[in-house]
Structure formats: structure tokens, C-alpha cells
UniProtKB/Swiss-Prot annotation:
GO biological process, one term: maturation of SSU-rRNA
PROSITE patterns noted in UniProt: RBFA
InterPro entries assigned to the protein according to its UniProt record, in alphabetical order: KH_dom-like_a/b (IPR015946), RbfA (IPR000238), RbfA_dom_sf (IPR023799), Ribosome-bd_factorA_CS (IPR020053)
Top-level division of the source organism's lineage: Bacteria
Protein name according to UniProt: Ribosome-binding factor A
Transmembrane segments: none
PANTHER family for the chain: RIBOSOME-BINDING FACTOR A, CHLOROPLASTIC-RELATED
The keyword Cytoplasm belongs to this UniProt entry's keyword annotation: yes
GO MF annotation terms: ribosomal small subunit binding
Family: Belongs to the RbfA family.
Subunit structure, as described in the record: Monomer. Binds 30S ribosomal subunits, but not 50S ribosomal subunits or 70S ribosomes.
Function: One of several proteins that assist in the late maturation steps of the functional core of the 30S ribosomal subunit. Associates with free 30S ribosomal subunits (but not with 30S subunits that are part of 70S ribosomes or polysomes). Required for efficient processing of 16S rRNA. May interact with the 5'-terminal helix region of 16S rRNA.
Any one Gene Ontology cellular component term annotated for this protein: cytosol
Length: 121
């Protein structure tokens, strides 16, 4: 039962944080496309690790990540207003490059397949 509730809390916090980033943050440094990939709220609901995937060049990624980290207090307050929990979790923003890593592996596999096709001819 507790696992089920934790999963629901994670998904609800993820949905609200995505909405806050998309609609409510007005920071001009957030220029790249940002998506929240995962949220892990601790069992005591004191902390929430928010994994974000940022698309763009390296400079805009760094600026966007810094802007999100500096906006974590605002995000926390908004989550507290929107979701009724015993504690409003402290938001910890972390970069998630798993999507880019997956795309890189796909490109390597495509190159290997091309080389095999070329060698077989």
C-alpha cells in the first residue's frame, strides 16, 4: 500500500512541476526545451529529486539548469499550494542526460549496422 501511495505522490509532483516550469516560470535563461523525466520523493516527503532533460547546446543547458536550481524555492512554494501533503518537499534539480545517451547509443548501433552491411556486399 505504501509503495502505491509513493508512486502516486511521485507522479502528482512530477505533473505539477512540469506545469510550473512550462507555465509559471518567467526566467529568460530558460530558453531550451525542458522536460521533467522523473521525480523521486523521499519516504518522509522532505526532499524531491527532480530529473530534467534539457535539449539545446551546452551553454543553454548550463544556463537553464542554473535557472531551474535558482527557481527551486518558487517551485517548492507552488507545489505546496497545489498539492496537500504533510510536508512540502525541498526540490533538488538534477540533469538527466539518459535520453541523449540513448540517442548516442542508437547512432553507434546504426554505424555498426552500416559497416556490417557494407562488409557483406
Amino acid at each position: 500500500m505504501a509503495k502505491y501511495r509513493a508512486g502516486r505522490i511521485n507522479e502528482e509532483v512530477k505533473k505539477e512541476i512540469s506545469s510550473i516550469i512550462r507555465m509559471d516560470l518567467k526566467d529568460p535563461r530558460i530558453s531550451a526545451m525542458v522536460s521533467v523525466t522523473k521525480v523521486d520523493v523521499t519516504k518522509d516527503q522532505r526532499y524531491a529529486k527532480v530529473y530534467v532533460s534539457i535539449f539545446g547546446d551546452e551553454k543553454s543547458k548550463e544556463e537553464t539548469l542554473e535557472a531551474l536550481k535558482s527557481s527551486s524555492g518558487f517551485i517548492r512554494r507552488e507545489v505546496g499550494h497545489r498539492i496537500k501533503l504533510r510536508y512540502t518537499p525541498e526540490i533538488i534539480i538534477q540533469n538527466d542526460d539518459s535520453i541523449e545517451h540513448g540517442m548516442h547509443i542508437d547512432s553507434i548501433l546504426d554505424k555498426i549496422k552500416e559497416n556490417e552491411d557494407h562488409d557483406n556486399k
